[in-house]
Amino acid sequence: AMEGPTPVSALIHAATMVTAGLYLIAKLSFLFILAPFTLTIIAALGTVTALLGATVALTQTDIKKVLAYSTVSQLGYMFLAMGVGAFGAGIFHVLTHAFFKALLFLGAGAVIHALHHEQDMRRMGGLRQRLPWTYATMLIGTLAISGIPLFSGFFSKDEILWSAYSSPFGSPVLWLFGFLTAGLTSFYMFRMIYLTFHGAFQGAHAESIHEPPMSMVLPLIVLAVLAVFGGF
């Protein structure tokens, strides 16, 4: 997914290819409910995966790698939901995650296209005036994945965290690590937005930067609408 074009990355990270195991657990939930210890292992592994993916994303400078490790973290969130018996919440997060993660990858592709294949965020900056549609839609995706209220990610993440705390299979410890991961997610995503779109431009060929054609912008707008309303 990392080496392919961003539309391929968007499809792979947003579609069921990376969530096949999650879907399997959901379909066999009637069996997993009978094995509480197995659910505990799933919840623990999901929590560790979510936290580890988020901490690695904090250190990345490649815009696509930030989103790739973000997917790892969000998959951990989904498995946390499965492990505490919140199978519906886990599948709900698959849906909302598909909207905002596809949006973010396609937005990253628009940025890379505008900068002549540059992916290092340290060589970006100040792009919000030159790429206003890309900036606005990626900001919406960032608000959604960060779990800001009324965006789609808020509803699914809130359900997962509540289940981690209140479910018979959950615990305050799982909730705490899930909450910490949510904070880290917000931090590294807004870090990406700041390095890419704010401050001064750090790259070359500033005069040639322009908004991608409408054929690239329109999917961003559609996905941005879904990232806002997909949780209702």
Predicted stretch roles:
Residues 1-215, 226-232:
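Hydrophobic transmembrane alpha-helices and their helix-loop junctions in integral membrane proteins
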Residues 218:
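His/Asp/Glu-rich metal/cofactor-coordinating catalytic motifs and the adjacent surface-exposed loops
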